[in-house]
Amino acid sequence: MTESVLDYMTRLGRAAREASRVIGRASTAQKNRALQAAADALDAARAELTAANELDLAAGRASGLEPALLDRLALTPARIDGMITGLRQVASLPDPVGAIRDMSYRPSGIQVGKMRTPLGVIGIIYESRPNVTIDAASLCLKSGNATILRGGSEAIHSNRAIATCIQRGLAEAGLPAAVVQVVETTDREAVGALISMPEFVDVIVPRGGRGLIERISRDARVPVIKHLDGICHIYVSQHADLDKAWNVAFNAKTYRYGICGAMETLLVDQQVAERFLPEMARRFVEKGVELRGCERTQAIISAKPATEADWHTEYLDAILSIRVVDGLNQAIEHINHYGSHHTDSIISEHQGEARQFMAEVDSASVMLNTPTCFADGFEYGLGAEIGISTDKLHARGPVGLEGLTCEKYVVIGDGQLRGQGSC
């Protein structure tokens, strides 16, 4: 009899829970060996990876997948290099598991501190980007967690090929294959099952469009680490170095349109708008970026009218909304009202203004004179990131190794008894 999706996912969950106990006590050397061996396997399987990815790209083009999504799906030689480098970098990172901090003596004579431990089993649900398979697997493995990966159907061939390489690395290190499992079925029922197994799964990390993440947040029976949108802003202040501002804003938008850290709205102080916008617009138009602006913007440059919906939109495309604001306070008000609490940056040479922006903008990352596309685990020194959280509980911002662990209290005594002594 054919196995049902629920039975299949239950089998994966049970295997992951058992594997989590093995990887949770694995040594740092053993985990690093698995990561290095997986990197070697990827390097040796470039032709297979490219062939599998081409199957996904061909299917995506045939189904009318948008250019930005096709870009996310593509495994170019440079991106394969990046995955290999990413595995080796994660192997070189300090292992957070078992680290003890804040040990102190209490009046009773006991010592109290905190120890980092794995979360257990992490379910990752993502769309389009096959490199997420490597990012997620490497971070979960190094942090001592088992993981169940459910990629989008559009990347099924790529994900299977990548998973094969990871399995080779695990085997070489003597670790069970169930430490990293890829959901083989494209049936959407698998997602519902994965987010409804608290007995097997400790946390879910969704990476994808708003619809996916809203559904996961609404229906999950286990905790979720997430962000809904990447509506990122750059504010060019009256104290900005305009040469710096032109370069930073251009990079923030055009580095890669399809990433959540791409700038979607450019805010410009009215004091510099007439000097800043014409050259900025020239660069964007030359690059093929469609500009949508407020009335004050349209009085200075050629741009389509920006609607209320534009300020709420994560384009993930070559489209940029521009607003001229009265000053710093209005810029902060705009960001906190329309933004997604992801990443926002100010271009300014005024330290007091920069401090106010960083203190009052309610986002996971706030930046000074920096493109928003730097919101990335590698750039922050975390290694690969599992995702970016805009929530305020457990983890906020790019989630790396430490964000995939939790703390438990460690108490050391020498036979002390409660109710005796100074307490």
Swiss-Prot record:
Pathway where it operates: Amino-acid biosynthesis; L-proline biosynthesis; L-glutamate 5-semialdehyde from L-glutamate: step 2/2
Record bears the keyword 4Fe-4S: no
InterPro entries in the record: Ald_DH/histidinol_DH, Ald_DH_C, Ald_DH_N, Aldehyde_DH_dom, G-glutamylP_reductase_CS, Glu-5-SA_DH, GPR_dom
Main location (coarse class): cytoplasm
Subcellular location, record wording: Cytoplasm
Stored Gene3D superfamilies: Aldehyde Dehydrogenase, Chain A, domain 1, Aldehyde Dehydrogenase, Chain A, domain 2
Function: Catalyzes the NADPH-dependent reduction of L-glutamate 5-phosphate into L-glutamate 5-semialdehyde and phosphate. The product spontaneously undergoes cyclization to form 1-pyrroline-5-carboxylate.
Assigned protein family: Belongs to the gamma-glutamyl phosphate reductase family.
Protein name: Gamma-glutamyl phosphate reductase
